[in-house]
């Protein structure tokens, strides 16, 4: 027998805010929805049931759900202006995990669809509260390890009778903003803001536990990262832009690449009504092995500054694959046409996450750099692309930083300090932690090739960063600047995560009420060898390189494209299509001034403008089972 909820009734304990509320207000973007009977977020139990939500719309409207496999619309799919009930049917959630469904409404005359509410359906195995795990696992760890444990203990009165993830969230919120370094403000494309904590807890399976160690995690699906983009002010012209594909993934083998724009999936045209659902089912959620997907893709046409009318069909079949974080690498060598002895070589690597299981892939890239250095005589610059890198394992960060630092990481025969760590006062006192407790750069004690063996005499290190660049990525910038390396930041302001996590789990202590957990609280703040850690608002791009607000952040070409030429009004014009182009051009201007060389390059003043109507749309942020790095974690994992 299904349980029937009527969310128009106020006073229910699981509703997170006042029941009846309007969406549009004097200071809010207009949505066309003036009333809804639910909070922004609600929770329901795992049993099969129906949920009814009442809305009032100003004009004709249609309802959508983010995943029709989890919930279906059985009443109120559309209507005219007025007040209506929307009924969603949920099947029983017999999995180990909670699952999320978002209800949307698209109102006639309003460009963007509006989020009515996000519904979390607990697993039937969850009894409504997790008092045991809250009392005996989460809270003791917070009391001992959390960086703001003193403030948490002073606040006291934890609410044990909650779901395990809600317990953590309410505990952290209880001392906000004292712990404001534990999180960031997320702003959607419609201007809605939400605070997101870095600290997190997950209910896991034994498979998930292995991700905290240096073992390669295997995934199933196509292996492509996408987001929605519109070239039209009314947001009706929707494509899924391919940001990147993992090497050797099914998508890569099928020919899908960065710079492709997906217009159809299995014959269905992508629109503002279905892009969210199609993205979830084909690229965000794991796809069963053997599933075939046919895409119609196009590329950006630099002559028309619009998507090309020519399309290509790509068919790919889901399989298992590894997420190698080294997405692309290359070496670019330029020779002056006026003096052939004048050469400069530039190494380029796109690194997506600090994953210790793939440190050997970093070594392979630097082997390629070393080969180029031996052939040309030098490798003068390196461009490290961290635009999508939200962090990861500190040991991997330490290794890559050592490779980049070379001999500058040494003080005589001894390695310099890579990082100082500050823990909470209780741990500092009890454990004798002080500023003399530090981590050095890797030297010849590294269990692979000695990090200093390459010793590239880089004149300058360019780092490409964005607001997604966080944690260990920022640690690398801070550490290298701390020993005097010239690091130039290109792109946008970074995330600002100068704190890190230690990952705890129940694998050794045993299951709690039949479940295992991974808990990653913020436990330390990081400083470079100069004692600097003042980047909680992010690192600001260097002068002339603040580009994130421009269109170079869109995937308009494949990786490593230097410049693009096109015909405009009968004349040849040049474009710098990416952050990489700007970094490369800056290097060439230094090495080959116009008066001394005719090396092909361009000046920013000649860079033609890109179309103003290009706009990125919000996409779902879904954590997969086992993906512990999803919230920009620094992981002190063995």
PLM feature segments, named:
Residues 42-47:
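Short, solvent-exposed loop/linker segments at the N-terminal edge
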Residues 91-98, 287-289:
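Surface-exposed, short loops/turns at beta-strand junctions within beta-sandwich domains
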């Amino acid at each position: 027998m299904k349980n029937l909820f009527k969310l128009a009734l106020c006073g229910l304990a699981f509703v997170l805010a006042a029941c009846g509320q309007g969406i549009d207000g004097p200071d809010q973007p207009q949505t066309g929805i003036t009333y809804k009977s639910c909070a922004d977020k609600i929770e329901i139990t795992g049993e099969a049931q129906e949920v009814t939500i009442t809305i009032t719309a100003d004009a004709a409207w249609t309802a959508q759900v983010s995943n029709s496999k989890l919930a279906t619309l059985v009443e109120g799919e559309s209507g005219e202006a007025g007040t209506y009930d929307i009924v969603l049917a949920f099947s029983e959630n017999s999995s180990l995990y909670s699952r999320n469904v978002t209800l949307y409404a698209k109102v006639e005359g309003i460009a963007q669809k509006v989020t009515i509410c996000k519904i979390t359906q607990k697993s039937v195995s969850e009894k409504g509260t997790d008092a045991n795990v809250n009392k005996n696992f989460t809270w003791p760890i917070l009391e001992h390890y959390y960086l703001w444990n003193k403030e948490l203990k002073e606040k006291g009165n934890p609410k044990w009778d909650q779901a395990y993830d809600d317990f953590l969230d309410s505990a952290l919120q209880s001392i906000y903003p004292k712990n404001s370094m534990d999180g960031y403000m997320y702003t959607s494309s419609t201007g809605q803001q939400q605070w997101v904590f870095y600290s997190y807890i997950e209910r896991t399976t034994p498979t998930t536990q292995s991700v905290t160690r240096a073992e390669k995690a295997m995934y199933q699906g196509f292996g492509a990262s996408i987001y929605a983009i519109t070239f039209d002010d009314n947001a009706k012209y929707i494509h899924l832009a391919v940001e990147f594909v993992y090497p050797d993934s099914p998508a890569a083998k099928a020919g899908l690449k960065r710079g492709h724009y997906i217009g159809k999936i299995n014959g269905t045209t992508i629109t503002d009504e279905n892009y969210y659902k199609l993205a979830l089912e084909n690229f965000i959620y794991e796809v069963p092995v053997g599933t075939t997907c046919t895409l119609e893709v196009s590329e950006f046409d630099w002559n028309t500054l619009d998507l090309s009318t020519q399309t290509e069909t790509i068919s790919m079949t889901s399989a298992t694959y590894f997420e190698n974080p080294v997405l692309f690498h290359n070496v670019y060598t330029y020779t002056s046409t006026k003096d052939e002895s004048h050469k400069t070589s530039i190494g380029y690597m796109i690194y997506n996450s600090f994953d210790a299981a793939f440190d050997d892939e970093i070594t392979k890239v630097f082997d390629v750099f070393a080969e180029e250095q031996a052939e040309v005589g030098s490798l003068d610059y390196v461009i490290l692309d961290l635009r999508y890198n939200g962090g990861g394992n500190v040991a991997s960060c330490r290794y890559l930083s050592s490779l980049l630092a070379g001999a500058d990481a040494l003080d005589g025969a001894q390695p310099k300090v890579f990082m100082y760590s500050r823990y909470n006062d209780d741990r500092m006192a009890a454990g004798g932690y002080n500023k003399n407790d530090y981590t050095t750069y890797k030297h010849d004690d590294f269990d692979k090739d000695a990090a200093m063996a390459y010793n590239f005499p880089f004149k300058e290190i360019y780092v490409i960063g964005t607001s997604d660049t966080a944690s260990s990525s920022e640690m690398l910038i801070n550490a290298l600047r701390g020993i005097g390396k010239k690091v130039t930041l290109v792109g946008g302001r970074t995330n600002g995560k100068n704190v890190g996590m230690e990952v705890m789990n129940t694998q050794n202590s045993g299951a709690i009420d039949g479940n295992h957990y991974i808990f990653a609280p913020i436990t330390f703040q990081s400083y470079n060898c100069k004692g600097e850690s003042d980047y909680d608002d992010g690192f600001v791009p260097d002068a002339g390189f603040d580009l994130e607000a421009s269109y170079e952040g869109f995937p308009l070409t494949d990786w490593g494209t230097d410049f693009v030429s096109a015909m405009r009004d009968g004349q040849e014009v040049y474009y710098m299509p990416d952050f990489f182009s700007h970094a490369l051009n800056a290097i060439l201007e230094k090495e080959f001034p116009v008066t001394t060389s005719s090396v092909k390059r361009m000046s920013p003043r000649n860079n033609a403008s890109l179309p103003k109507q290009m706009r990125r749309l919000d996409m779902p942020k879904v954590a997969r089972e086992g993906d512990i790095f999803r919230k920009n974690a620094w992981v002190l994992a063995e």
